[in-house]
């Protein structure tokens, strides 16, 4: 929850804003959906795995968009009413960053947190679009010790309202390799935890 907590602050995400989360079914993505819902935003989950959509809807998304669909761009514009106020990209591949930037509305903010599949992904953003729409592009990495403490306090205060990290799979050391493989291949919705 600490990283999504930081993203809310860094992105100046406010109640009733239209927010898209790319990689919404992933470990950080699903936590971001929960935080954006807690912040009273209109939330769209974007993912390539439709099997994760039910969990996305259950944990904060109002709508889900299949990033592999031929009409993904139109679906994003429809979901946002013409453009998002903030897009949070946990994938940060060339394709996702360009799709995210294209779906921003005037004054929109793009926050990138992913490693582009382990690569240094480049993406194109038209200078006139950046100027005319007054788009902001921000990187965000990790969270501070203070943000961890603040997010833990928030979870303690809001746990009864569903603001808890979503752990969908646990294992001891004997299943560690299987969990690592499933995380690496995006087969886990939410988080996996090692139980000692």
Residue ranges and their predicted role:
Residues 49, 116, 143:
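Residues in the short beta-alpha loop(s) of Rossmann-like NAD(P)-binding domains
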Residues 109, 124-165:
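Rossmann-fold dehydrogenase core element
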Residues 20, 44, 109-111, 138, ...:
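Structural detector of well-ordered beta-strand residues that form the stable sheet scaffold
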Residues 4, 36, 56, 100, ...:
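Residue-level signal for nonpolar/aromatic packing positions in well-ordered secondary structure
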Residues 1-69:
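Mid-domain Rossmann-like dinucleotide-binding core that forms the NAD(H)/NADP(H) cofactor-binding site
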Residues 28, 32, 52, 76, ...:
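Aromatic/hydrophobic pocket-lining residues that form π-stacking "cages" and hydrophobic walls in ligand
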Residues 11-13, 54-135:
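Glycine-rich cofactor phosphate-binding loops and adjacent beta1-alpha1 units
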Residues 98, 145-196:
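C-terminal hydrophobic helical "lid"/dimerization subdomain
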């Amino acid at each position: 929850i600490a990283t999504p907590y930081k993203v809310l602050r860094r992105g100046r995400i406010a109640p009733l804003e239209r927010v898209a989360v790319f990689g919404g079914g992933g470990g950080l993505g699903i936590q971001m959906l929960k935080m954006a819902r807690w912040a009273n935003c209109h939330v769209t989950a974007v993912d390539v795995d439709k099997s994760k959509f039910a969990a996305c809807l259950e944990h904060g998304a109002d709508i889900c968009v299949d990033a592999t669909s031929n009409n993904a761009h139109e679906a994003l514009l429809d979901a946002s009413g013409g453009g998002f106020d903030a897009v949070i990209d946990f994938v940060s591949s060339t394709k996702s960053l360009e799709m995210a930037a294209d779906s921003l509305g005037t004054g929109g903010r793009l926050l990138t947190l992913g490693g582009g599949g382990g690569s240094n992904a480049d993406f194109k953003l038209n200078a006139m679009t950046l100027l005319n729409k007054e788009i902001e592009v921000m990187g965000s990495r990790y969270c501070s010790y203070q943000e961890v403490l603040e997010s833990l306090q928030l979870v303690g205060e809001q746990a009864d309202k569903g603001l808890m990290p979503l752990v969908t799979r646990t294992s001891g050391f004997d299943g560690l390799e299987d969990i690592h493989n499933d995380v690496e291949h995006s087969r886990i919705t939410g988080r996996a935890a090692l139980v000692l």
